Structure formats: structure tokens, C-alpha cells
């Protein structure tokens, strides 16, 4: 046993220090980025935000809607091959370039992903997702996926430390998914005591990944557009959003009505709700590590997407970054004890 004395920070612990700027308007900010990935060699350009691979967020409808904003969607792994085929038949090439195919690490998951990727060559992204990216089996699966799909861009996670980030990149991942426990419907930190404050995880993993020519996606912990800006400021190449995109018309959650008001269910992918739906219940040897919440219906996701992108542009103007790429170089974080004046938040 040992204790690390270094202070670790989450998004709520900091603000971005403003700096002189020559930008006249938020409209001057370029949010699109262009990446060439280490292993796949593929080049992609767009806004580096990803809708999370949760079945109440990462839906085909969400992919259609967010492609119009140049945003990616990691489509959840629970669609059948037939459902994928039907979606591909109606989706444009532009939509497909904004889609990630999500998979687990079982043999059945692998075979299903092989079939999905064979449906259309425009599917260039694979998202290999497990709750605990520290297992040797996971590393071996990433290597197997890289061998099977040498020209596909592979995103793999989740981890929170530099050495494991490096391990996954060296095993074939182009993008490493960073985050254990920060999600709005994740209870891993409560159930297990395991986790890492998200901003510090992003900073440390970005440093490790960029040294090897890899990239990271900050997954979880964003509750408002300012958190997205902080994640990019901390060095994230991509930011993945779950709760911020839940509860919309395109989100795919079940709608319930209480006292004349409609709500949409949103749950973590390790929650009892998710396991009841997909694997017949919580196994006897494990505990649920997610919760289910009811969100007021929020209308079309386009309104929220515009709000997020607008906040991100504004953050860039406050530090003089004319492009999103420049944000991390221009970011100075200050530690704080308050984020906002909350006097009217309950009204």
C-alpha cells in the first residue's frame, strides 16, 4: 500500500484564466480539427465531440442529427447486424463518416463487428469499450482488433493513467478513452472506491499519448459547456458526452409520464436497468455500477449541440484561440472553490 500525495483535480476545481485576444467575434473561431491517426493512417476532419456509446445516447437517430453539426456518434453495441444494415441503407456517406461502431471484447462481439464493418467501407471508426481497461485480456483484444482491421481507426478504453494509455497505443489503439467513474449515471467510485479526478486524468493521459503520436478522448464528467472547454484545455483531442446529450428526441430512452409531465429514462451501461435489458439481470458475482434517472424531455438535440458549440467558441475567444487546436496551448487553469453564483439556481 502507498499514498500518492499529489493533488488531483476535476473540472469543478478549476476555471480557465482569461487572456488578451485579437478575436472580434465568436464566429471567428474554427472548431473543426483535422487528425491523421497513428495506426490506421486515416485522416478525419470535424468537430471532435463524440456522443457516448450508451443505448440512451448513441442511437442511429442521434448520429443522423449530430452529423449535421460535424459531431461524431459512438453508436451503442446493442443494435443487431440487420438494424445496422437498415440504417446504412438510408444514411448518407457524410453521416457514416461521423459514426463509430462500438463493441465489447467477447468472441461474439468481435464476430458481430466483423459483419457490421463489412456492410460499408465508409465505417472507419471502431470503439472498443469496457469499464476496466486495465485487464490483460482487453489489451490483447485491442491488438487482435488492430490486426483484423489495420485501416480502421480504433478508440479503446477506459483508463485513467499514463502508463496504461501508452500500453493501449502500443497495442494498436489510435485514440484512448479516458475516464473511470466521472459519468453522471456511473457509480463505480461509490461501489468500488476506484477512480481518478477527470481533469488530472486527461492532463496526464494526454501527455503520455501525445508522446507516442496517439490521441485521447475525455469520457465523462462534463455537465456543462464550460467542462467541455476545460477538457480540451487540458489536452483532450476529443470529448465524449453522455448525460449532456441524454433526454432528447433522438436519445432512445423510454418515456414515462408522471403527474402529466413526460420524462425520459437515462441509465449507466453498468446499471441494473442496462443489465436487465441486455443480459437478463445482474450476475450473482457482481454489483450494478450505474444508476437510472428520469430526465425532463429536452426536445431536439440540435438545440443542445448549438449551446455546447457556442460555449466552446466563447471559451476560445476569452483566451485568444482562433482555432480549437490552439485552446490547450492558451489555457492556464486556476484553482477555485466556487464555479458560479448559485443564489437563483433553485428557482
From Swiss-Prot:
The active site is at 186 (thioimidate intermediate). GO terms for biological process: purine nucleotide metabolic process. GO terms for molecular function: GMP reductase activity; metal ion binding. Pfam families: IMPDH. It catalyses: IMP + NH4(+) + NADP(+) = GMP + NADPH + 2 H(+). NADP(+) binds at residues 108-131, 216-239. It is an enzyme of class 1 (oxidoreductase). Keywords: Metal-binding, NADP, Oxidoreductase, Potassium. Belongs to the IMPDH/GMPR family. GuaC type 1 subfamily. Catalyzes the irreversible NADPH-dependent deamination of GMP to IMP. It functions in the conversion of nucleobase, nucleoside and nucleotide derivatives of G to A nucleotides, and in maintaining the intracellular balance of A and G nucleotides. This is GMP reductase. It comes from Salmonella typhimurium (strain LT2 / SGSC1412 / ATCC 700720).
Amino acid at each position: 500500500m502507498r499514498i500518492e500525495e499529489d493533488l488531483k483535480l476535476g473540472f469543478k476545481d478549476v476555471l480557465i484564466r482569461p487572456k488578451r485576444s485579437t478575436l472580434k467575434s465568436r464566429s471567428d473561431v474554427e472548431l473543426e480539427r483535422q487528425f491523421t491517426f497513428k495506426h490506421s493512417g486515416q485522416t478525419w476532419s470535424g468537430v471532435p465531440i463524440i456522443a457516448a456509446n450508451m443505448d440512451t445516447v448513441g442511437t442511429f437517430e442521434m448520429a443522423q442529427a449530430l452529423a449535421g453539426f460535424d459531431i461524431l456518434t459512438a453508436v451503442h453495441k446493442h443494435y443487431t447486424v440487420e438494424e445496422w444494415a437498415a440504417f446504412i441503407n438510408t444514411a448518407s456517406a457524410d453521416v457514416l463518416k461521423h459514426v463509430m461502431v462500438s463493441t465489447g471484447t467477447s468472441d461474439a462481439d468481435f464476430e458481430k463487428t466483423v459483419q457490421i464493418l463489412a456492410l460499408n467501407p465508409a465505417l472507419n471508426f471502431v470503439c472498443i469499450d469496457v469499464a476496466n481497461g486495465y485487464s490483460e485480456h482487453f489489451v490483447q483484444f485491442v491488438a487482435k482488433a488492430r490486426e483484423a482491421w489495420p485501416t480502421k481507426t480504433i478508440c479503446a478504453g477506459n483508463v485513467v493513467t499514463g502508463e496504461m494509455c501508452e500500453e493501449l497505443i502500443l497495442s494498436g489503439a489510435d485514440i484512448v478513452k479516458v475516464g473511470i467513474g466521472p459519468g453522471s449515471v456511473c457509480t463505480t467510485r461509490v461501489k468500488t472506491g476506484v477512480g481518478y479526478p477527470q481533469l488530472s486524468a486527461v492532463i496526464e493521459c494526454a501527455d503520455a499519448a501525445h508522446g507516442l503520436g496517439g490521441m485521447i478522448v475525455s469520457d465523462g464528467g462534463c455537465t456543462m459547456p464550460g467542462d467541455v472547454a476545460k477538457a480540451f484545455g487540458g489536452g483532450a483531442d476529443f470529448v465524449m458526452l453522455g448525460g449532456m446529450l441524454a433526454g432528447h428526441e433522438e436519445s432512445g430512452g423510454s418515456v414515462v409520464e408522471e403527474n402529466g409531465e413526460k420524462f425520459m429514462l437515462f441509465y449507466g451501461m453498468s446499471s441494473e436497468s442496462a443489465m436487465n435489458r441486455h443480459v437478463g439481470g445482474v450476475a450473482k458475482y457482481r454489483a450494478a455500477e450505474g444508476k437510472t434517472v428520469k430526465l425532463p424531455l429536452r426536445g431536439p438535440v440540435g438545440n443542445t449541440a448549438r449551446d455546447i458549440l457556442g460555449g466552446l467558441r466563447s471559451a476560445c475567444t476569452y483566451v485568444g484561440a482562433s482555432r480549437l487546436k490552439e485552446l490547450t496551448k492558451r489555457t492556464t487553469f486556476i484553482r477555485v472553490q466556487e464555479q458560479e453564483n448559485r443564489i437563483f439556481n433553485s428557482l
